Amino acid sequence: MSIALQVALVMVTILVILLIIGAPIGVAIGLSSAVSMICMIPANVSFATSAQRIFAGSNSFSLIAIPFFILAGNIMNNGGIATRLVNCAKVIAGRMPGALAQSNVVANMLFGAISGSGAAAAAAMGSTIGPLEEKEGYDKNYSVAVNVASAPVGMLIPPSNTMIVYSSIAGSVSIAALFMAGYIPGILWGGAVMILAGIMAKKRGYQAEERVTFKIAMKTFWQAIPSLLLIVIVIGGILVGVFTATEGSAIAVVYATVLSLIYKSFKLKDIPRIVLESAKTTGIITFMIGLSSIMSWAMAFTEIPDMIATAILGLTDNKILILLLINVLLLIVGTFMDVTPAILIFTPILLPICTAFGMSPIQFGILLCFNLSIGTITPPVGTILFTGCRVGGVTIESVIKYMLPYFAIIFVALLLVTYIPAISMFLPKILGLV
């Protein structure tokens, strides 16, 4: 057994043990990487290299967009924007069977597109639409299942922090192209949930709402336009080259702050609290990115990506089977690991395999985010699942059986994204981004 393989086994073993005993993911990544580096090079060189890699890994202009988008999302979550989006969604989906559940899905897509956070969308919609559904006699488990199943769409529809993290790790992958690539898969996910929610609503006898007048519909849309305009300004500005994703994220913060103050949904004294919440989240993400940079260097040094690629390619050279194996691996990883560290760890390992089979790094990025987004709604560490159940006042055990049909239809959507490149690549190509 080569020294590189021995070191790789040490690193993986320490990482797995630390995760099993409940160590924070950042600590597990950093400690396992540091030990493996000490095994390869002298301690003084190892410590110096680790410090340099932490700084280099987090010293990226594109990563500055993450704290700004997090702050913008938190401002909007506290700024009364959710209510206006819910009203808009009710007009769009009000005539469908199970109107409130359908409105929940549409509102999650809209709110997720603005905030970029699936957990924030689940919390906002659960506290806004949930009480309305209960008043109309909807089963609470059914309502929570629809909310949880549709909330991760916000991680695919831009702006998406997960795509920014992937772009920083993957290298020369355009953030604008990734943003555009996420639209159709995100809408596909949301549409699949709406179809199933409608079928189940019909069986349960949940009716459509009364038709609203044209005047009320226009008034509702008009009230939602300022919130939705944020998407147009940020994504449109990035696409036409007026500003970068980082500059667009700063504009999003200013716009969200001004809009929330105009709505009088919060006061200036609330801003320090919101900034502190955003800083905590940003600190966690940046910490993991820096430490994951050490792991990426250690994996490259020990040739772990090459060994894994050789092992997978040794099983079969069939592209369909290899992509299926990668999906299964990512689904398992997403069940036990949060999205950001999973992207940081597995992008250097799996991206070379997929590109070797002719898959675009953009399509792989969407495939990666899609798989790991499913992990956010599966136990034992599904953040969106926990958030939705907590806000909805139900237990995870009771809602899981209602989730099973949604898992099935989301897996079908995943296979379509995997094997039909046009779903991810159509918009980037037509807009000249690739």
What kind of feature is each model-predicted range?
Residues 1-434:
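Alpha-helical transmembrane segments of multi-pass membrane transport proteins
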